[in-house]
């Protein structure tokens, strides 16, 4: 069967990370999924199609505009997929537990207190569940960040440049993530640094 909601081919940034996420995710029809920092729905739409009507996907993003855009794209399709506004660092304790928690390019937004945010997130994972997060770790994509910084400088975006440089300076490493997950008591912790091609225009 041809998927109706594949990962978008025209997104050179989110899709490569989402492909890695799907490669690592052990997803079954009927699973319940919490997708954090869902953005424009990559890979929430794809996840919802995979779990089917017996499952559920709650996709959370802090930006109201992103949520409205994703709902507009969804229309009446896949009613078991729900987009909601929320801060993944401070999710309400009334949320249920999920079989899977995913976050594509989300871990970078946990700053400044990543361990505390991760600890809050893990409490929503069912026993035996799986957490899969993708993020550009320390020492990766440095040539890309230089290009972004140069473009921001050209546009006089000094506030944005400052925020970017703060992020670059305090990026977590893969070992940081592994240590934090183990401290939180997760089992079978696997941290992979996967080479990705992110196309840029010079």
Predicted features and spans:
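Conserved alpha-helix/loop element of class I SAM-dependent methyltransferases that forms part
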Residues: 12-31, 46
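Helix-to-beta-strand junctions that scaffold the AdoMet/dcAdoMet cofactor pocket
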Residues: 52, 110-112, 125-127
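Conserved catalytic/acceptor-binding region of the Class I
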Residues: 128-201
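A short acidic, Gly/Pro-enriched loop at the edge of an enzyme's catalytic core
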Residues: 89-101
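Class I SAM-dependent methyltransferase SAM/SAH-binding core
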Residues: 32-91
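A short glycine-rich, Lys/Arg-flanked "PGG" loop and its adjoining helix->strand segment in the class I
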Residues: 115-130
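Class I SAM-dependent methyltransferase Rossmann-like catalytic core
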Residues: 1-12
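A short SAM/SAH-binding and catalytic strip from SAM-dependent methyltransferases
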Residues: 99-114
């Amino acid at each position: 069967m041809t998927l109706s909601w594949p990962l978008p081919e025209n997104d050179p940034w989110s899709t490569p990370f989402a492909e890695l996420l799907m490669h690592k995710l052990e997803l079954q029809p009927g699973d319940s999924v919490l997708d954090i920092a869902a953005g424009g729905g990559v890979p929430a739409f794809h996840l919802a199609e995979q779990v089917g009507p017996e499952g559920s996907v709650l996709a959370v993003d802090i930006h109201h505009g992103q949520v409205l855009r994703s709902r507009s794209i969804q229309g009446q399709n896949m009613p078991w997929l729900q987009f909601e506004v929320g801060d993944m660092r401070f999710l309400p304790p009334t949320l249920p537990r999920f079989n899977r928690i995913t976050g594509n390019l989300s871990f970078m937004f946990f700053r400044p207190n990543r361990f505390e945010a991760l600890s809050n997130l893990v409490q929503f994972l069912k026993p035996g569940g799986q957490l899969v997060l993708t993020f550009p770790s320390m020492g990766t994509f440095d040539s890309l960040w230089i290009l972004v910084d140069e473009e921001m400088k050209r546009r006089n975006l000094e506030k944005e440049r400052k925020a970017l440089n703060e992020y670059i300076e305090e990026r977590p490493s893969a070992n940081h993530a592994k240590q934090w997950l183990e401290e939180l008591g997760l089992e079978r912790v696997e941290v992979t640094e996967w080479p990705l091609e992110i196309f840029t225009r010079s």
